[in-house]
Amino acid sequence: ETAHGKLRMLEKGCFQDIDVALMMHGSPTTTVDVKSMAMSKFTVTFHGKKSHAALKPEAGRSALDALLLAFQAVEFLREHVPEDTRMHYTISQSPGPVNVVPDTAVGVFSLRSYSRQKLDGVVERFLKIIQGAALMSDVTFDIKEGDRLANKIPVLKLNDLLMENA
């Protein structure tokens, strides 16, 4: 799911002279699938200011607070996106002891939809969430976009031919 082999082949020019490609996955049954989700993946690093949480909490700016606010905002966004949208996230880094305001927090976000066009609209709103979380926490952020995948465009007639000859 995350190696994106066909994307790498496309980038290297493997499909230059090809009009149609048939994709196969091992399965105990013979089936055809007409769906594949578009995906945008982001790694977001919030940068705050470290401070002792008991002795001088007002001097700190919590990068982790910003990341948690972003997570919560994604939860609120779920009600306002197309039904087929999927949004996932995880904390990949937030070092330090619990009594120190963390100056770094890293989250990974995966946004998916069966429509690249619809997903692009969700991505716009997601980017505003990250900006807002940083603003609310008085921190800065870096964002790195990972692979940007298009949804598969099925050729239903080919699916029918495949099943007729399976």
Question: Where do the model's predicted regions map?
Answer:
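Metal-dependent amide/peptide-bond hydrolase catalytic core
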Residues: 68-166
